[in-house]
């Protein structure tokens, strides 16, 4: 499992959440490297990326076994499948600054979630802390920008 997903799984356990729905595309890209449209679900035991069927093949080609993310086509999920994603989950986190009220109600209805809990920007706070790879990429981008101005 990649380090960012592992970190988030540990974090949600530490704040007494059983699962989390990540729908902000920026946070999904940060956690997985995926840029395709969809939602990321960190369940009790498994991680799912639910997307439109047009993206399933592309997403599967980018993920590795180590990512431990199951890719599902939204059209292939029955109501029972959706409900089972959060089976035995008492508290499910969501991104309160990104999710609209109508989407909140949709999550409650579609996934039969008992208690959706605001996560208070836990991913955004972690994104602010840069790892070595991110610092390297920022430095490279700055150097390219400097070269443009010198030209």
Show which residues each predicted segment covers.
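Compact, glycine/acidic-enriched structural inserts
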Residues: 51-80
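Short, surface-exposed linear patches
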Residues: 41-45, 62-64, 70-74, 113-117, ...
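Terminal domain-start leader segments
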Residues: 1-50, 57, 86-89, 109-114, ...
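Fold-independent oxyanion-binding glycine-rich loops
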Residues: 23-25, 52-53, 96-97, 121
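Residues that cap or initiate secondary-structure elements
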Residues: 46, 55, 98-100
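Flexible, acidic/His-enriched mid-domain "rim/lid" segments that flank
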Residues: 3-5, 76-151
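Short, hinge-like loop/turn segments at secondary-structure boundaries
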Residues: 37-40, 66-67, 134
């Amino acid at each position: 499992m990649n380090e960012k997903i592992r970190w988030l799984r540990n974090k949600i356990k530490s704040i007494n959440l059983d699962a989390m729905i990540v729908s902000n595309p920026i946070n999904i890209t940060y956690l997985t490297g995926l840029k395709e449209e969809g939602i990321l679900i960190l369940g009790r035991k498994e991680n799912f990326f639910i997307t439109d069927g047009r993206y399933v093949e592309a997403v599967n080609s980018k993920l590795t076994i180590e990512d431990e993310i199951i890719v599902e086509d939204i059209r292939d999920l029955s109501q029972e499948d959706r409900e089972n994603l959060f089976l035995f989950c008492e508290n499910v986190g969501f991104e309160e600054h990104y999710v609209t009220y109508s989407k909140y109600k949709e999550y409650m209805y579609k996934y039969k979630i008992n208690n959706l809990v605001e996560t208070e920007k836990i991913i955004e706070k972690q994104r602010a802390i840069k790892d070595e790879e991110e610092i390297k990429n920022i430095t490279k981008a700055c150097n390219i920008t400097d070269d443009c101005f010198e030209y």
